[in-house]
Amino acid sequence: MALLSATAPAKTRFSLFSHEEAQHPHPHALSACCGGGASGKRQRARARVAAAMRPADAAASVAQAASPGGGGEGTRRPRVLVAGGGIGGLVLALAARRKGYEVTVFERDMSAVRGEGQYRGPIQIQSNALAALEAIDMSVAEEVMREGCVTGDRINGLVDGISGSWYIKFDTFTPAAERGLPVTRVISRMTLQQILARAVGDDAILNDSHVVDFIDDGNKVTAILEDGRKFEGDLLVGADGIWSKVRKVLFGQSEATYSEYTCYTGIADFVPPDIDTVGYRVFLGHKQYFVSSDVGAGKMQWYAFHKEPAGGTDPENGKNKRLLEIFNGWCDNVVDLINATDEEAILRRDIYDRPPTFNWGKGRVTLLGDSVHAMQPNLGQGGCMAIEDGYQLAVELEKSWQESAKSGTPMDIVSSLRRYEKERILRVSVIHGLARMAAIMATTYRPYLGVGLGPLSFLTKLRIPHPGRVGGRFFIKYGMPLMLSWVLGGNSTKLEGRPLSCRLSDKANDQLRRWFEDDDALEQAMGGEWYLLPTSSGDSQPIRLIRDEKKSLSIGSRSDPSNSTASLALPLPQISENHATITCKNKAFYVTDNGSEHGTWITDNEGRRYRVPPNFPVRFHPSDAIEFGSDKKAVFRVKVLSTLPYESARGGPQILQAA
């Protein structure tokens, strides 16, 4: 029976459901206040109605929990208390209820997701976590996958933050497909929590309740809330995050580890031109890095990490400005996303984790998710590990229950908790370490000798590849497939009752393999429109280049009378009358210098400037700068955009005919 302090004010529950429901106090709190009698009968009637509205297995759980004479562990499944209604806590509650357990989830504020929905934005649910959800409840997993945005069917990987060039590409599709697992998705944290809470059931979630202490007397656990209320159960699971109160009571005060990085995050209404071919990128830099990901609905989510002391703040409306200063000189993919994000949509938080521990619990209490293995977000596995935790804990509880039912002896809850911990510790510790390694690699990246060397920084002008960059690429190229295979598929053999099958909708583009091997093919598959944007503030208008192999663009000091509809006149001293020509072939653009006196120059995305040889077509790429006649007034930046942010560009001359 739950115990409620007579002096504590009654709390209401918060419903996440979209449909209207009659609100009633939590059943355990009612039993403490009202006892039996007419009120108790009304409560049992409400429980029967609620049971009828839930799936059969959940209804069986309520019926079994409400059965008379169920006071001992040998005659009923144990009552599970869960501190924390985040992703891990709700997944455990769902898994336990589907197996017939009575569950109570205590959450401070379901409507705010403990700030996660606001401060952490969408979450990546990778193949291993989606498979665990399928093993728990297929209908819930289907809803999560419908609501999510698939990213695992595209190119993902690491790129150089300055140039935007690919460093290494990740194949997250093949490891999933080979093991019959769902493909990685990104979903709003709020949406994910609402799906899980709806499946768990409103009657099992007690809102405005914060577990701050507990008493384990060896036979039961009493959870003590911040307002003084007390609830009894057979076990307590601390799923209350990195600053867990349950962890503190178990093992005493311990400090989280500051990663030395602060993180800015935002969501922008922005569609990059390669949205159909690239899911997410990690832009590498020295003591800073940037992550961008498609999250669906025409939005991009990004994270900007910068090495600095903890506790820093920004002046009012100063985040966007500071980010542009930090990432000054970085590639267009980064700068465009920052520029496209409203100031009020940018949030900041310091990044902490906790070192791996081999002691997750004591007695009838254990920990789950961030409360025991909070990790840095670099692998996108923090929430995934919590989902795996929830599944495994429910499995171990059920094993103990079945053993006790067969033997007719009381269920050994303590042993089941220790088995759960033993099953999870090694895998979680390895992935925790990989997340830390990923952060180190992302922030110690040096493309060239001289980067980060202070007085020797002039060496960067020589463009000598840094040995660490070369060695790192070799290691990642051959080590990453093995690592991804184990991270995404290493837990699949433990998923009971889940068939090894792929979803027909999780189909990758038939060019995916080619895109992994050929950067040019990936660029050619990019959507959007190509533009030449003038870098000076002169009279030149942005020029839209549209793919048509039958037409060409003439550049000269005056319009070409033989090509008047596709001619760019630049009346400048260093521009020859018939200076250069731009053509399109196989969805790529080329510039040919027509023997001009002052030449045509290209500065590529690596910062290398070279002269185009006369009468020979040279391919140019996004982010390149093309200089006609070595005149600063005739310099154009190549950009590819899905939507052009400049009104003047929309009205600019259309030079080439669309393909």
Curated annotation (Swiss-Prot):
Pfam families: FAD_binding_3 (PF01494), FHA (PF00498). FAD binds at residues 79-107, 357-370. Keywords: Abscisic acid biosynthesis, Chloroplast, FAD, Flavoprotein, Membrane, Oxidoreductase, Plastid, Stress response, Thylakoid, Transit peptide. One of its GO terms (cellular component) is chloroplast thylakoid membrane. Residues 553-607 form the FHA domain. Its cofactor is FAD. One of its GO terms (biological process) is multicellular organismal-level water homeostasis. Induction: By cold in microspores. Disruption phenotype: Accumulation of endogenous zeaxanthin and reduced level of ABA. Wilty phenotype, increased water loss and premature seed germination. Pathway: Plant hormone biosynthesis; abscisate biosynthesis. Expressed in young microspores. The keyword Thylakoid applies. PANTHER family: PTHR46496, ZEAXANTHIN EPOXIDASE, CHLOROPLASTIC (PTHR46496:SF1). Zeaxanthin epoxidase that plays an important role in the xanthophyll cycle and abscisic acid (ABA) biosynthesis. Converts zeaxanthin into antheraxanthin and subsequently violaxanthin. Required for resistance to osmotic and drought stresses, seed development and dormancy. This is Zeaxanthin epoxidase, chloroplastic. It comes from Oryza sativa subsp. japonica. The lineage of its organism: Eukaryota, Viridiplantae, Streptophyta, Embryophyta, Tracheophyta. The gene is ZEP.
